[in-house]
């Protein structure tokens, strides 16, 4: 089934101009990241135009979208707040994140933080004092407790260069009042690890100090790591706070000693959007021999009589391309994903032109004839027509013409950018 495209309506107007400018800016940025050869100083992309000749589209298949189109982009946070994310268990996945078994299983993978944990607090240096736990850090000034009424005192003292038993690490090992309040709440230990600590316990840290037997090495918290205690300590009653700390420290040391944990941290599977019945994908055989235009300039360096003696501007005008490939257009909710398939993927999904012709003629294909190979030959961009000129025109004549080296380099980069950014698994997404 063939499709007739209103090319003028699709590429003109404010939307068409904005899309053309976006493509020009994208190609320009890619050229700034390319390692240029010695004889080229810079490459600038000035304009892009879709032309007036539309492509020929033939629908080959309508199917379900590829799974890659459902992956949640890490950078796309604001536009997906209202969308439902699933990861194997549907909507239950969000609620399971806050359950204690999830935290116990994730203890060995501490660098990954639960983004949906409501108990998480940012660093005290960045958040107002009202967000701090009033039981853990009382507002009233308590003489004798370093830091006063907030943990800001600890940060200032640590910057001042504490030494010996006054450092927070030594304070934790010795069971001093620092053991209860010096950890940054942003790490999640003070607010999530010990929610059962009551107000009197926090106001009188000497009771906590008395519960720790400093003569027994096994009862002292581990100093091999500054990571917070195991989250399972939150399930311990308030009377067994010391036992919970011991269990968390021992379990944490076991995880730190595990080579599988330290060397190869586990990663959560990518978050996936939920499939819906209205999602669909169209595979089209696209042929294009149009007059798309791309204007570039490259500055060539001349090394005579000395290195980089003078630079000459080379103007390149792409006046048309010939394209033959398979396009993928997927519609998912309010997004349209667009890309092309490589020659191998296209042959696997819809077959090649030789296979279709052989099926219509009912003639067997002979492997001895290399010209009848069913594989698609070459890249997606079959031909790029270009015009070039160097220097300024004098009396209507160009100073130099058709500098082959620069042309080949620029056109090779255009092909590379197209195949890396437009061929699956790379794709473009448009919000509609």
Curated annotation (Swiss-Prot):
Q: Where in the cell is it found?
A: Mitochondrion outer membrane; Endoplasmic reticulum membrane
Q: Which gene encodes it?
A: mdm12
Give me the stretches of Basic and acidic residues compositional bias. 243-253, 355-364
The alphabetized UniProt keywords are: Endoplasmic reticulum, Lipid transport, Lipid-binding, Membrane, Mitochondrion, Mitochondrion outer membrane, Transport
Name this protein carries in UniProt: Mitochondrial distribution and morphology protein 12
CDD domains per the record?
SMP_Mdm12
Q: Which InterPro entries match?
A: Mdm12, MMM1_dom, SMP_LBD
Give the membrane topology, semicolon-separated if more than one. Answer: Peripheral membrane protein
What lineage does the source organism belong to?
Answer: Eukaryota, Fungi, Dikarya, Ascomycota, Pezizomycotina
Q: Which GO terms describe its molecular function?
A: lipid binding
- Let me see what the UniProt entry remarks about domains: The SMP-LTD domain is a barrel-like domain that can bind various types of glycerophospholipids in its interior and mediate their transfer between two adjacent bilayers.
Q: Name one GO cellular component term.
A: ERMES complex
């Amino acid at each position: 089934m063939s499709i007739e495209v209103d090319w003028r309506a699709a590429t003109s107007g404010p939307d068409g101009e904005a899309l053309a400018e976006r493509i020009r800016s994208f190609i320009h940025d890619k050229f700034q990241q390319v390692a240029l050869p010695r004889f080229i100083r810079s490459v600038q992309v000035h304009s892009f135009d879709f032309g007036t000749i539309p492509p020929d589209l033939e629908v080959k298949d309508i199917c379900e979208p590829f799974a890659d189109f459902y992956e949640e982009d890490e950078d796309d946070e604001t536009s997906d707040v209202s969308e439902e994310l699933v990861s194997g268990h549907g909507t239950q996945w969000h609620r399971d994140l806050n359950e204690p078994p999830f935290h116990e299983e994730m203890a060995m993978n501490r660098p990954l933080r639960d983004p949906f944990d409501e108990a998480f607090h940012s660093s005290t240096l960045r958040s107002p004092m009202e967000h701090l736990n009033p039981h853990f850090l009382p507002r009233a000034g308590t003489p004798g407790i370093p830091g006063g009424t907030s943990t800001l005192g600890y940060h200032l003292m640590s910057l001042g260069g504490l030494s010996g038993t006054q450092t927070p690490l030594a304070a934790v090992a010795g069971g001093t009042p620092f053991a209860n309040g010096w950890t940054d709440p942003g790490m999640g230990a003070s607010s999530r690890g010990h929610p059962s600590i009551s107000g009197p316990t926090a106001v009188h840290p000497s009771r906590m100090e008395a519960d720790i037997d400093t003569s027994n090495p096994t009862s002292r918290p581990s100093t091999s790591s500054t990571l917070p205690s195991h989250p399972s300590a939150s399930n311990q009653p308030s009377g067994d706070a010391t036992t919970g700390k011991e269990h968390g420290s021992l379990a944490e040391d076991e995880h730190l000693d595990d080579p599988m944990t330290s060397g190869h941290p586990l990663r959560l599977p990518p978050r996936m959007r939920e499939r819906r019945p209205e999602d669909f994908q169209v595979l089209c055989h696209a042929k294009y021999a149009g007059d798309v235009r791309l204007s570039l300039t490259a500055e060539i360096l001349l090394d005579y009589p000395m290195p980089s003696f003078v630079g000459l501007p080379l103007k390149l005008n792409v006046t048309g391309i010939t394209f033959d490939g398979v396009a993928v257009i997927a519609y998912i909710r309010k997004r349209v994903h667009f890309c092309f398939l490589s020659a191998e993927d296209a042959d696997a999904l819809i077959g090649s032109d030789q296979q279709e012709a052989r099926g219509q003629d009912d003639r067997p294909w002979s492997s001895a004839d290399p010209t009848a190979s069913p594989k698609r030959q070459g890249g997606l961009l079959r031909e790029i027509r270009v015009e070039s000129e160097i220097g300024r025109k004098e009396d209507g004549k160009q100073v130099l013409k058709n500098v082959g080296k620069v042309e080949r380099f620029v056109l090779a980069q255009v092909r590379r950018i197209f195949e890396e950014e437009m061929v699956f698994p790379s794709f473009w997404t448009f919000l509609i």
